[in-house]
Amino acid sequence: YTGIIADSGRFLYDNTTTATLGAASFLYDCGIDRNKIHELLYRRPLNIVQAQGFVLSQFEVSEAGVAYFKMSKDVQDSYGLTTGTRSALVNTLANIEGIRVWVCFFENEDGRIRANIRSNGPIINEVAARFEGGGHPKASGAIVKAWDDCQALLDELEQVCHTYVKELN
């Protein structure tokens, strides 16, 4: 059940099917403690909530709906984040009106920048593949060599969003 909830985003993501819901229903009927699982999955440590505050105060968004934030290694350290725990910040910008694509830029130990890219519509994995990355159509990752290189990734995502909007109309 935990995997189903996490992978389907609490049944919000496109990968949720009748089979997904059926499996969850079966597990519920087997007596799982759904409330305890949800509490363990979604309760946030204070440092993560504080880091989310940083994200919400620092992110920028373009006219086409590409949002991003940059988090240096020093800032990550100030919030006690690790490579593993910083993933809790990836969906901070997920449900903000007008944002189609969002990118979380995290400086790694080696100075390269990890870009976690997510989408509410446009296909992003092809862009990620051009930046030493890849992934799923709406959830991908990439690597840029330095902070100055982030703009090239953002520019490509901006184009993807413009194309997406044209195709919708």
Q: What is the role of each PLM region?
A:
Residues S8-R130, G135-N169:
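Hydrophobic helix-and-loop "lid/oligomerization" segment in the mid-to-C-terminal part
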Residues T2:
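Active-site histidine-anchored catalytic micro-motif
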